[in-house]
Design a protein with these regions (language model features):
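Histidine-centered metal-chelating micro-motifs
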Residues: 40-42, 77, 81-86
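A cytosolic small-molecule/anion-sensing beta-strand core signal
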Residues: 56-57, 72-73, 91
């Protein structure tokens, strides 16, 4: 059994959000992502992996190109494999992230696809 203390894994940067992988298997990855207000991810997708975010603290906007939702501590969202998405922190925010799938690498896009 592996164990991680999430609170001790928190780390923030004024330049960009900090993402730390905590536990990894061949088909999954558990990580923590720490965001300062206003920090945003590129528009991207993970073609081979589902991505689940659980908001530990703070709040942010989660966008799939069709819907933008404000999530707060205690909320959870899932982006199925291949779904384009973007995350923006409204306040200092800590996310618990689980990726499930063999190919978890992100594919960045310059803009939202026309066929949203």
């Amino acid at each position: 059994m592996d164990f991680v203390d999430l609170k001790s894994a928190e780390e923030f940067s004024p330049q960009h959000h900090v993402h730390k992988s905590l536990l990894t298997t061949s088909h999954s990855d558990i990580s923590i992502a720490c965001w300062e207000p206003g920090q945003t991810s590129p528009i991207h997708r993970h073609p081979g992996a589902d991505e689940i975010y659980h908001v530990i603290s703070g709040s942010g906007l989660f966008n799939d190109g069709r819907t933008e939702r404000r999530l707060v501590a205690g909320d959870t969202v899932i982006f199925p494999a291949g779904e384009v998405h973007q995350v923006t922190a409204l306040t200092r925010m800590v996310l618990y992230r689980v990726q499930a799938g063999a190919d978890r690498h992100p594919e960045s896009l310059d803009a939202w696809p026309a066929s949203r």
